């Protein structure tokens, strides 16, 4: 009987310890980021991370009273590293139907639009019949690559994948590719608002698909509902206190409405 009582005490003690560990306040959020996508995330001449996603991430951490740690990645969609707990979340990713099978997402941070960009005189449109035989540049492991390989490549469109957007834009300007499928904000920054972009423009209507998504959110492990809920709550507070609108205003985005 004494042995049973001792075991019960040990079990209760261990359970209490486990509960105590679980309720420890969060002190840090490690955000993964691919720092070569201005104006969303990049490094300035001093090597500091700057951009919309960096500002939003830092504001969320400040709202939660935790330290923000940024972990550089070559590509955004590094789910194996997320699942291996090399970081806690991936900052700034479109929550597509394909990605939702692997990870969970927070509420939307802001909307995005995908467009085809080519020379003004090309006559191209985001129609796979018109793009047949044309070379379209996309970024490796991006939602646009997944869409182009799935929807356009089978129709004879030549899909060229690039690790860096700078390389993709250089290939477009030099004529090594005929067009690119990009987000409106980043291609403005990378090409259309520069001297090299004078001969280029958006061609045809926006491209919509479940493979592309129409917004950006934060990816977390499917099991980490606590972090997702904390980030959602912090985002709601930023929307209500006006900080969210202040951060987004310079980036020429359609601002999501503040929540009641």
Map each language-model feature to its residues.
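Bacterial N-terminal signal peptides
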Residues: 2-15
């Amino acid at each position: 009987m004494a042995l049973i009582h001792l075991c019960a005490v040990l079990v209760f003690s261990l359970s209490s310890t486990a509960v105590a560990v679980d309720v420890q306040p969060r002190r840090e959020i490690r955000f993964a980021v691919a720092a070569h996508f201005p104006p969303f995330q990049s490094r300035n001449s001093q090597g500091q991370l700057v951009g919309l996603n960096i500002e939003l991430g830092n504001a969320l951490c400040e709202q939660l009273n935790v330290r923000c740690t940024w972990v550089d990645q070559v590509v955004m969609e590094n789910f194996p590293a997320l699942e291996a707990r090399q970081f806690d979340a991936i900052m700034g990713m479109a929550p597509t139907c394909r990605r939702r099978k692997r990870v969970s997402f927070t509420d939307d941070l802001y909307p995005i639009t995908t467009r085809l960009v080519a020379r003004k005189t090309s006559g191209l449109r985001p129609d796979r019949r018109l793009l047949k035989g044309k070379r379209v540049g996309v970024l490796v492991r991006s939602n646009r690559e997944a869409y182009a390989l799935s929807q356009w490549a089978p129709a004879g469109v030549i899909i060229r994948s690039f690790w860096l957007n700078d390389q993709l834009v250089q290939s477009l300007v030099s004529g090594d590719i005929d067009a690119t499928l990009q987000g409106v904000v980043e291609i403005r920054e990378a090409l259309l608002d520069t001297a090299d972009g004078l001969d280029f423009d958006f061609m045809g209507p926006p491209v919509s698909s479940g493979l592309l998504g129409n917004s950006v959110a934060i990816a977390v492990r499917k099991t980490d509902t606590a972090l997702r809920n904390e980030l959602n709550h912090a985002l709601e507070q930023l929307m209500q206190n006006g900080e969210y609108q202040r951060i987004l205003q310079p980036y020429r985005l359609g601002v999501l409405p503040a929540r009641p």
